[in-house]
A protein has these predicted regions:
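Conserved helicase NTPase motor core
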Residues: 16, 42-46, 141, 145-248, ...
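ATPase/helicase motor core of nucleic-acid motors
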Residues: 22, 252, 327-415
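Short glycine-/polar-rich loops that comprise or flank the Walker A/P-loop
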Residues: 11-14, 220-224, 230-232, 252-257, ...
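Helicase P-loop NTPase motor core
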Residues: 254-256, 262-357, 383-384
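Conserved ATP-driven helicase/translocase motor core recognized via long
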Residues: 58-62, 76-153, 158
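Extended, charge-rich low-complexity interaction segments
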Residues: 47-58, 290-300, 388-413
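Conserved P-loop NTPase-based nucleic-acid remodeling module centered on helicase motor cores
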Residues: 2-103, 247
Length: 415
């Protein structure tokens, strides 16, 4: 807002700048929609809560990708059931994939055994009474595959319900809860503040729920909503973003769409590669794709596809290419773009072995490091001395307790 005030001038104190999660958090706390002592937990703390129920080492789970992914599925499933209970439209479900085909088959088998109809209410009822259905996996004549499906589902339901109950009893919210609770409140309360002017950046990154919240925030009479997005970036479906989001907005904003057609940075030969991919793989209209005003011609080996037989050889070949480019012109810089932080770490190690100086931009967000989380926890308790999660982080951070689970139990006993 300081930058906006310098450019535009005037009073900008009423201007809200932030992502959808930030707006939801600000709304819930400042409008007293949740208890004053509520606290927001991150993924690490959510895993710690479930690990405590499962009597597993929370740090061991965090270090093991497959186990961590299983915990995430439990968390996602809890949100799935919440949305089912609150009758959210299917297109707004955050994690429909958490209710797998195997889960559906398991539910159908339980319903068949119990002689009840298979529907949403059956799913919700079994979820809330999962332990009462464990014997369904031992029904005589039931094949082993279906029995395993039932066991996996019921344990997932049980721990998801435990996670939900723990959050409710301790006034905790995870990041998805911020969206879900804000959506529910705005959907039913006409007195909530609506906004006449809204600007949404990186709209291709929004999932259906986030877009629905923005719609609920908008006044009905003559609103001005500006969406800024990039169709070529709408490929990150693992984040919940989809090309369909932009397609929906294009239909909604028909006649009021402006395309930025000129790319001033990339040479034409490189931009053509990305445009061809966008047209043929993402099915984006060629007329909507940018053109370059940099018509420099490609030199030999400017565009190359290098085949590697193994991951290790790929890392070595990438390192060799980067080193050759550096030796050809030490004034130029080379960027190596990878798909994950672990890939960056491995390539960095390979470059270190051959003495190739480089700067690695990857790793965990600074604000998720233990030291920064500990610092922010101190500030949090100054603002709200009843913030139990902040106290838990402090007690774990100063090594008063070896785990978040023990620190949480101690805080609970102090209440």
């Amino acid at each position: 807002t300081n930058r906006i005030q310098k450019v535009v001038g005037g009073d900008s104190t009423e201007l809200m700048v932030g992502n959808v999660h930030r707006f939801c958090s600000k709304f819930l706390f400042e409008q007293d929609k949740i208890p004053a002592d509520s606290a927001i937990i991150d993924d690490e703390e959510a895993v710690s809560i479930i690990a405590d129920y499962r009597n597993e080492d929370e740090e061991g789970v965090t270090r093991d990708f497959n186990r961590y992914k299983g915990y995430q599925t439990i968390i996602f499933f809890q949100h799935f059931i919440y949305q089912m209970e609150h009758q959210h439209p299917w297109k707004y479900y955050l994690h429909p994939e958490s209710f797998t085909d195997d889960d559906r088959e398991a539910i159908k088998q339980i319903c068949k055994s119990q002689k009840r109809e298979y529907n949403e209410q059956a799913v919700i009822d079994i979820y809330h009474h999962a332990q009462q259905y464990v014997d369904e996996a031992n029904v005589p004549g039931l094949d082993a595959k279906t029995a395993d499906r039932i066991r996996v589902l019921l344990w997932k339901m049980y721990y998801a319900a435990c996670y939900a109950q723990y959050k409710e009893e301790n006034h905790l919210l995870d990041f998805e809860d911020l969206l879900l609770k804000t959506y529910d409140i705005y959907s039913t309360d006409d007195t909530c503040k609506r906004y006449k002017w809204i600007q949404v950046d990186e709209v291709q990154d929004l999932n259906g729920m986030q877009l629905a919240i923005i719609d609920l925030l908008t006044v009905k009479d003559n609103p001005m909503v500006m969406y800024l997005g990039d169709e070529q970036q709408a490929i990150f479906s693992f984040m919940g973003a989809k090309v369909e989001t932009l397609t929906l907005l294009k239909m909604r904003c028909k006649g009021n769409i402006h395309h930025l057609q000129r790319n001033h940075r990339s040479p034409k030969y490189l931009l053509d590669v990305f445009n061809d991919y966008a047209e043929k793989q993402l099915k984006i209209d060629r007329e909507l794709l940018p053109a370059s005003d940099n018509d420099v011609k490609a030199k030999p080996e400017n565009l190359r596809i290098i085949h590697s037989s193994t991951i290790d050889s790929e890392r070595q070949e990438v390192t060799d290419v980067a080193r050759n480019l550096y030796e050809q012109n030490k004034e130029e810089r080379t960027a190596v773009i990878v798909s994950s932080n672990s890939d960056a770490d491995h390539i960095s190690e390979t470059m270190d072995k051959v003495g190739l100086t480089h700067f690695k931009v990857s790793g965990r967000d600074l604000f998720y490091t233990p030291d920064v989380k500990l610092l922010l926890s101190h500030l949090s308790v100054l603002a709200n001395e009843h913030n139990s999660i902040a106290w838990t982080r402090i007690m774990k951070g100063v090594r008063a307790f070896p785990s978040h689970a023990l620190a949480r139990r101690f805080n609970w006993k102090l209440k």
